[in-house]
Amino acid sequence: NLRDSHAARREHHAAVSAASGGPVKPHRRPNKLLRRVAAGAMACVLTALLVVTGQSVQSERVVNVCSWGEYIDEELITQFEEETGIRVNYQTAESNEALYSLIKMGGADFDVIVPSDYMIARLIEEDMLAELDYSHIPNFDLIDDTYKNLSYDPENKYTVPYAWGTLGIIYNTTMVSGPITSWDAMFDPQYAGQVLMINNSRDALAAALLDLGYSINTTDPGQLEEAFNLLKNAKDSGVYQAFVMDEVFQKMEGGNAAIAMYYAGDYLTMLENNEDLAFVIPEEGSNWFVDAMCVLKDTQHMAEAEEWINFIASTDSNLANMDYIWYASPNREALEQYPAYYAEVNEEELDPEIYEIMAPPAETLDRCEIYENLPKDTLRLYDRLWTRLGV
């Protein structure tokens, strides 16, 4: 019984807290791992169904969605299908760069994608996105103005924000010598073999740039070469156990690595399964990002795509998503209502420190930069440096 399990968990933490003389980090529902497995199984079933039914699927209304792992409450997919009769083929990509390659090579049949800000700007620049008809997406009015008309889509023709968050360092407090405060930890030989570096070029080089005191949007080849050398030296000296994306969950939850560079919302998911984990936005600053829904220009399912986007942009969908993915909502009603929603669903108050990690205050975001779409010459340099790194 989930409710009894949750109550027992609270009693256990209270006992631990009393014995230790202080509070322990809160956990939420203990069933996230089961839901993660179920989500993967559901994705396999959806894909298999599309293959097996073949021609019959062609006569159905369908929308093909590509997003990130651990990035939707899958019950929303079921609800949308039941309410609309539209079949959702939901797939995932590991990174913005991997998503771009899939689209560019023509090997992907996506309608709706959910890239990050800088990749959206690139897709717009390369004329790969369709303009949206916002009269078909009335829930766009619920998106806070803070997340409209941003640099990646200044006239707001192509996107509806999905979620926002920050990039930082996750660490196991039992496996490090003290609290981590700097990006130095990602390059520190004292943690050789215990560090997980993120497996995409933009974020990995950003860590090195920040550690060196440079902007994550620099186009200076000398600064990028210096950042590359910092990263390469750490790799060659055995600092990194692995370069990872979704594998980070298992490794950090299982205590198989001490330090990882990853996203705040995913840290909160990991915290459910390992209370020894902590998160920090380093003193040098970091990246804060907005992921947004958009539609590829060659879509054959524009009506279905806009219906899906409108459904996901609703307050109810955003509340459910926040409670599942632990990322902040751009929907102003959902962001305001979430602490009360959490308390009702989980029968306990939301820890203010947890909420601050999920939705950082302005003074934290002021230390962070949004990724800009870089010039083509700089993007080519990133590609060359990443190839030289040999990940």
Which sequence ranges carry the predicted segments?
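Conserved C-terminal helix/tail region of periplasmic/extracytoplasmic solute-binding proteins
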Residues: M358-V391
